Amino acid sequence: METLSYEIVINAPRQKVWDVLWNERTYSEWTQFFSPGCVMKSDWKIGGKTYFLNSEGAGMVSTIDSLKEPDQIIFKHLGMLDKDGNEDTESMEVKQWSGCFEKYILIDFGGKTKLHVEVQNEKEWEDHMNSGFTQGLEVIKKLAENI
């Protein structure tokens, strides 16, 4: 498991960047580089359920480990969800990475926002994450600065 970090400075206040990150419409825009048609469904509760899903309804089962809007959110990934809605949090494949974190930290940077993202991941996904976050953060910047 490795930790990858990404950062961008956005000429917008933290709340605006937060809203672009997690608004249903804009979330799909910046996450399209991971998988077109991505959605996030969450009860927004620490210890509750959050799902990161592709256009077919399959994806990751996660929970919110820490939530301090608009400063930070930390997701802990627990398992997989297939397109039929079956959760897998127990298989050997899932247990190899279950418990890894994905962190979004928004720092006030003189009226701008420094968005810092950290994601724990298997080495085999590094190129996919680098491509997705590099392009995705640019979309977040564009949306937050122009909405």
Question: What are the language-model segments listed below?
Answer:
Residues 33-36, 120-121, 135-147:
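Structured surface interface patches that mediate subunit assembly and partner/cofactor docking
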Residues 3-5, 58-62, 98-102:
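Short, surface-exposed coil-to-beta transition loops
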Residues 1-38:
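Hydrophobic ligand-binding cavity/cleft-lining segments
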Residues 10-15, 65-73, 105-114, 142-146:
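A short, structured loop/turn motif at beta-sheet edges
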Residues 32-33, 55-58, 122:
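Short beta->alpha connector loops
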